[in-house]
C-alpha cells in the first residue's frame, strides 16, 4: 500500500467518526452553523461597508489595518513591517501561503519558521500541504520520524509520536523566545471591534501572537463577520466539523497589548506586542463575490470535512488543487484566487461534499460552473 493510502486511511478512521460523535453530543452545533452562514452572507452582501468598518475598528484599538488587492501589495507591506535579517515565527495561515509571504521574507534574508507541527514538517520536507487542517496528513509516523532525525535529531522512525512532538516543541521554543515578528492568519474578524479570533490546539499561535514585539495578521476579506458575538461562533463551528471539539485554545486579539491598572486608564503596550497589523486581502475574492455562483466559495470556514468524504481526494490527495488549497473546497478556491479551472475537472460529482458541509455550500454546483467556464476557455479567473 502506498504511503498516501496508509496515511489518509489512518486520518479518516480517526477524524470522520469524531465529527459525528461531536454533533451527536452537542446538538446545538448545527444551529450555530446556520447562524454563522447568515452572518457571513450579511457581510458578503455589504462587503465594502464591513471592510471599512473593520479597518476603522482596528485603528480605534491602536492597531494598523491595510487593504491589499493582490500578493505583490501584501508582500510589500509585510516586507516593510518586518525588514531584513529578522527572526519570524508563523502560525498556520493558508492566505499567507497563497500570497507567498514566507518565501518573500526569506528572500529578504529573514529567518522564517512555521510553528504549526504539520506546517513545520512540510517546511522541513519542502513539500506542499495536503490538507487544510492537517497539512502533513500525507506523512506516516515512520516518515515523520526519519525526517526529524535528519533535520533536528533526537528521534527516529521507531520513536513514539509523543517523543516526536517533544523534540519539535523544544526546537521551536527557542525560536519563539528570539522572534522579532509573529505572523498569523485569522479564523474570524469582528467588524464592530476590530478583533481577530484564532482557534488552535497546539499553543503555537499563542506564542506567535504574544511573544514577539510585532504581530501581523493576514486574512481574506471573507473572514469578516458583523460583530464579535458572530465571530465567536466561528471557532466553535470550525473545530466541531473538523472533529477537534472543543478546541484547546481560542485566541482573541484586539490590537496591541494594553493595561488599565493605573487609574483605569488604558495604555499600550504592556507585556505583549507593541504593534498589531491586520492585512485584509482581496486577491480575487471581491470579484468572486459579485458572481452569484462563485460567491458560495467565500462561505467556506476551512474545516476540511469535505476532503475526507470525497472519493477523488481520498484517491489522489494533495495533487488535486493549487497549494495550499486542496480537495473539493480547494478546487473552488484554486479558481477564485488563481483563475485555475483544471482542479474542478477532477470532480466526479459524488455529492458527498455538499452533504457534509456545515455552511451548506453546494460545492458540486460551483465546480460544475467552473468546469463550464474552463471548457469555454475562460482563463481570466478572479484575480485578473
Task: Give the location of each predicted region.
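The feature marks the mature, well-folded catalytic cores of soluble enzymes
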Residues: 1-293
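Ferredoxin-type iron-sulfur electron-transfer modules in oxidoreductases and energy-metabolism complexes
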Residues: 268-297, 307, 312-384
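Phosphate-binding glycine-rich loops and their immediate beta-loop-alpha structural context
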Residues: 300
Amino acid at each position: 500500500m502506498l504511503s498516501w493510502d496508509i496515511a489518509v486511511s489512518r486520518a479518516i478512521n480517526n477524524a470522520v467518526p469524531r465529527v459525528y460523535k461531536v454533533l451527536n453530543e452537542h446538538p446545538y452545533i448545527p444551529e450555530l452553523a446556520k447562524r454563522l452562514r447568515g452572518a457571513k452572507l450579511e457581510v458578503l452582501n455589504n462587503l465594502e461597508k464591513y471592510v471599512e468598518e473593520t479597518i476603522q475598528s482596528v485603528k480605534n484599538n491602536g492597531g494598523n489595518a491595510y487593504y491589499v488587492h493582490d500578493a505583490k501589495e501584501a508582500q510589500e507591506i509585510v516586507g516593510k513591517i518586518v525588514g531584513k535579517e529578522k527572526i519570524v515565527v508563523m502560525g498556520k495561515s493558508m492566505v499567507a501561503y497563497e500570497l507567498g509571504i514566507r518565501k518573500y521574507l526569506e528572500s529578504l534574508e529573514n529567518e522564517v519558521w512555521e510553528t504549526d507541527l504539520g506546517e513545520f514538517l512540510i517546511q522541513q520536507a519542502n513539500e506542499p500541504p495536503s490538507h487544510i487542517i492537517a497539512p502533513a496528513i500525507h506523512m506516516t509516523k515512520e516518515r515523520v520520524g526519519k525526517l526529524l532525525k535528519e533535520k533536528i535529531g533526537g528521534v527516529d522512525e521507531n520513536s513514539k509520536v509523543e517523543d516526536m512532538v517533544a523534540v519539535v516543541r523544544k526546537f521551536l521554543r527557542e525560536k519563539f523566545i528570539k522572534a522579532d515578528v509573529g505572523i498569523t492568519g485569522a479564523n474570524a474578524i469582528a467588524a464592530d471591534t476590530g478583533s481577530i479570533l484564532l482557534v488552535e490546539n497546539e499553543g503555537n499561535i499563542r506564542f506567535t501572537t504574544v511573544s514577539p514585539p510585532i504581530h501581523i495578521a493576514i486574512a481574506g476579506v471573507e473572514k469578516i463577520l458583523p460583530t464579535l458575538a458572530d465571530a465567536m461562533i466561528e471557532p466553535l463551528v470550525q473545530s466541531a466539523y473538523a472533529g477537534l471539539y472543543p478546541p484547546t485554545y481560542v485566541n482573541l486579539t484586539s490590537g496591541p497589548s494594553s493595561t488599565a491598572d493605573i487609574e483605569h486608564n488604558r495604555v499600550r503596550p504592556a507585556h505583549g506586542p507593541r504593534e498589531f497589523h491586520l492585512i485584509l486581502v482581496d486577491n480575487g475574492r471581491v470579484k468572486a463575490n459579485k458572481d452569484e455562483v462563485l460567491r458560495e466559495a467565500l462561505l467556506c470556514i476551512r474545516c476540511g470535512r469535505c476532503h475526507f468524504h470525497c472519493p477523488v481526494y481520498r484517491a489522489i490527495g494533495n495533487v488535486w488543487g493549487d497549494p495550499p488549497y486542496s480537495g473539493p473546497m480547494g478546487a473552488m478556491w484554486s479558481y477564485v484566487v488563481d483563475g485555475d479551472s483544471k482542479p474542478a475537472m477532477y470532480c466526479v460529482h459524488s455529492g458527498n461534499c455538499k452533504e457534509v458541509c456545515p455552511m451548506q455550500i453546494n460545492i458540486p454546483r460551483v465546480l460544475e460552473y467552473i468546469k463550464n467556464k474552463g471548457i469555454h476557455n475562460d482563463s481570466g479567473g478572479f484575480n485578473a
